[in-house]
Amino acid sequence: GCCGLFGLKPTRGRNPLGPTTLEGWGGLSTTHAITRSVRDSALVLDCSHGEEAGSPYRAKDPSKSFLDLMTRDPGNLRIAYITDPFNGASLDPEVLSIVNETAEILASTGHTVEELTNTFDPDVCKDSHGTLAISHIGAMLQKLEAQTGKPITERDVERVTWNNFQSSKVISGA
């Protein structure tokens, strides 16, 4: 946020990943670009989105180009925010001040802004995300083994990837 660049995570199915890759990390990752502006990001989306043969799903086409949609009035948005991190850490006072100031600015422009209390259980997320990510890593590396005809060894991947690969052999992502 403070580096002069803009990042956007498009919705699943917005940008094709190629005919042999259905989704990244079980749908948790998508493909896009880091740009210098929102306008540049919209232009990249205009060039990159669309249907691809073999995709399990796709995002609905926009009513206009993403570049054109940038200029429309979004109307009154309903915006929620949370200031208590799910991991028990505390926000830096300066960050908290900026978040609250941003909420006030958004509310003053007519949006409905509401601060929510975090009811998120980090252990449940960690367990479910871990199962999904580890299962995906296992499937990806097994596919690579089948393509190359060679087993993946500890020397082929980073330690965390190797540990996740080993864990994937004793859990089910289904």
Question: What residue spans do the PLM features occupy?
Answer:
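Short low-complexity, flexible loop/linker segments enriched in glycine and/or proline
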Residues: 2-4, 123, 127-134
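Flexible, glycine/charged-enriched surface loops at secondary-structure junctions
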Residues: 53-59, 107-119
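A short glycine-/small-residue-rich loop at the edge of a beta-strand within enzyme catalytic domains
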Residues: 32, 90, 128, 132, ...
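Short helix-loop capping/hinge segments that flank enzyme active sites or metal/cofactor-binding pockets
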Residues: 68-83, 131-174
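Short polybasic/polar patches that bind polyanions
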Residues: 4, 107, 112, 142, ...
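Proline- and acidic/polar-enriched loop/turn elements at helix boundaries
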Residues: 15, 21, 118-119, 157
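An alpha-helix initiation/capping motif
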Residues: 96-100, 123, 158
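A short helix-breaking turn/cap at a secondary-structure junction
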Residues: 2, 6-102, 143, 147-151
